[in-house]
């Protein structure tokens, strides 16, 4: 590509994202047109409220220690912080859940598909050929996954031909992310095989057809999952109810608040175990000044212990 061609191409791209590569093929009869993605600096700009370090692709890197802390949280604790901040569109439900007893936590790696359109596909195929891109299709995105990622895929609710993975690729995702997880507004296949792989997944349906008649249009861009706008690098939290997508700038506060709630619950139950108090004397906060002082001291001691332990991990 000449310098002039490069300038013309960049000028044609929307300010929200830039084209960095085009179509990838599978060995079957269909192709994927792609791809819009954030250049690293744009991704940093759109997630500038996060103070965390950055992954090589520019996503906020919620620390591994915080990901582990989040596994002990409840959905109510996640929601409380989001609601307080006014982020009321961060929850998606209505999924089928693989391994429903296993909490899913990780950093969002987002992928977007759209229904295939031939004239768009033709241009994308030509650009892919110019750039010498491999014929990988959905695997192009999957091969970019890193440890700690959760693969978050907008497949516009597609069931037939909307299967982002079968058991082989699901196993690869598990290995690449170290068991992070999968959220897809679409379907999966080989459900019997998936059930034998120890990684949580949230999906709309299972279907025997391979993925097809779609275009891969975005990697690490904002995607829609249900009524949620998911940003690359969001903390993904999945439980028995559904999936929460937490902006990184709220993660530390959310975890600190959860620690305080856990300690409060711990102290409350200890006092109940003593058999000396009525519930109204202890829950939700102690009424007696001496008990209030005891609780404050207990809270400080336990939080110091928790944070010291986390610092050693």
Regions found by a protein language model. Give the residues of each.
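N-terminal secretory signal peptides that target proteins for export/translocation
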Residues: 1-15
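Bacterial N-terminal signal peptides
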Residues: 16-29
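N-terminal pre-domain segments of enzymes
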Residues: 34-79, 85
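Buried hydrophobic positions in well-ordered alpha/beta secondary-structure cores of metabolic enzymes
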Residues: 58, 173, 234-236
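Feature captures the catalytic cores and cofactor-binding loops of soluble hydro-lyases/lyases
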Residues: 73-77, 82-232, 245-277, 281-313
């Amino acid at each position: 590509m000449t310098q002039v061609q490069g300038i013309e191409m960049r000028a044609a791209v929307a300010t929200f994202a830039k084209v960095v590569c085009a179509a990838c093929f599978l060995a079957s009869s269909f192709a994927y047109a792609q791809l819009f993605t954030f250049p690293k600096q744009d991704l940093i700009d759109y997630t500038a409220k996060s103070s965390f370090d950055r992954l090589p692709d520019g996503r906020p890197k919620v620390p591994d220690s915080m990901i582990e802390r989040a596994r002990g949280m409840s959905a109510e604790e996640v929601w409380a912080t989001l609601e307080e901040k006014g982020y009321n569109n961060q929850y998606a439900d209505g999924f089928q859940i693989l391994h429903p007893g296993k909490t899913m936590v990780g950093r969002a790696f987002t992928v977007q598909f759209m229904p295939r359109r031939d004239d768009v596909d033709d241009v994308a195929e030509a650009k892919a050929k110019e750039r010498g891109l491999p014929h990988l299709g959905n695997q192009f995105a999957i091969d970019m996954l890193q440890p700690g990622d959760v693969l978050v895929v907008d497949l516009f609710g597609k069931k037939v031909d909307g299967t982002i993975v079968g058991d082989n690729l699901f196993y690869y995702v598990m290995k690449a992310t170290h068991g992070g997880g999968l959220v897809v507004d679409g379907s999966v296949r080989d459900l019997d095989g998936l059930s034998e792989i120890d990684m949580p997944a949230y999906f709309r349906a299972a279907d025997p057809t391979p993925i097809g008649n779609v275009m891969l249009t975005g990697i690490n861009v904002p995607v829609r999952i249900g009524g949620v706008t998911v940003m690359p690098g969001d903390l993904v939290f999945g439980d028995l109810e559904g999936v929460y997508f937490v902006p990184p700038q709220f993660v530390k506060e959310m975890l600190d608040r959860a620690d305080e709630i856990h300690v409060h619950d711990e102290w409350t139950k200890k006092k109940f175990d003593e058999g000396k108090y009525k519930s109204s004397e202890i829950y939700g906060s102690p009424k007696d000044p001496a008990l209030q002082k005891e609780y404050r001291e207990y809270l400080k001691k336990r939080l110091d212990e928790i944070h010291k332990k986390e610092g050693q991990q």
